[in-house]
């Protein structure tokens, strides 16, 4: 309960921004030394979402949806999704990929609203994993 006190005066938007910082740092750390999920280049990686975080908020913090991706693919090629998909299935397997797609289909039927407690859990989980 004491940990949550430091987040008491933060808005949901502020909590989401903090969660993004810690989650993306974890993804970059997890995929450090690996090639870009889309083009295979070895360069500085960003946290690239297969399903965009803006259009699909329910999988914004799903580790199967976010992988190390170079700036060129992530930003200039809008995710470079065709090779991303092929390499993603190879990396996580067809079963986990199908589960990710199912989550997307189910989420399309509902409006997603961020929960303060969920965001605090994300912040604390990835803060700990980044140590």
Q: Which residues are covered by each model-predicted region?
A:
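Short, surface-exposed acidic
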Residues: 92-102
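A boundary/linker detector
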Residues: 1-22, 43, 101-131
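Short cysteine-rich loop/turn motifs with clustered Cys
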Residues: 20-46, 70
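Short cysteine/histidine-rich metal-coordination sites, predominantly Zn2+-binding motifs
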Residues: 51-58, 85-93
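Histidine-centered nuclease catalytic patch
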Residues: 37-66
């Amino acid at each position: 309960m004491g940990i949550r006190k430091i987040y008491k005066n933060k808005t949901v938007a502020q909590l989401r921004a903090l969660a993004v910082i810690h989650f993306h740092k974890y993804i970059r750390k997890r995929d450090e030394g690996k090639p870009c999920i889309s083009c295979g280049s070895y360069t500085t990686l960003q946290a690239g979402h297969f399903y965009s975080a803006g259009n699909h908020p329910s999988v914004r913090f799903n580790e199967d949806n976010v992988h190390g991706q170079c700036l060129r693919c992530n930003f200039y090629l809008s995710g470079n999704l065709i090779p991303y998909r092929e390499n993603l299935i190879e990396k996580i397997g067809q079963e986990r990929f199908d589960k990710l797609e199912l989550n997307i289909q189910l989420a399309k039927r509902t409006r997603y609203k961020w929960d303060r407690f969920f965001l605090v859990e994300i912040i604390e989980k990835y803060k700990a994993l980044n140590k």
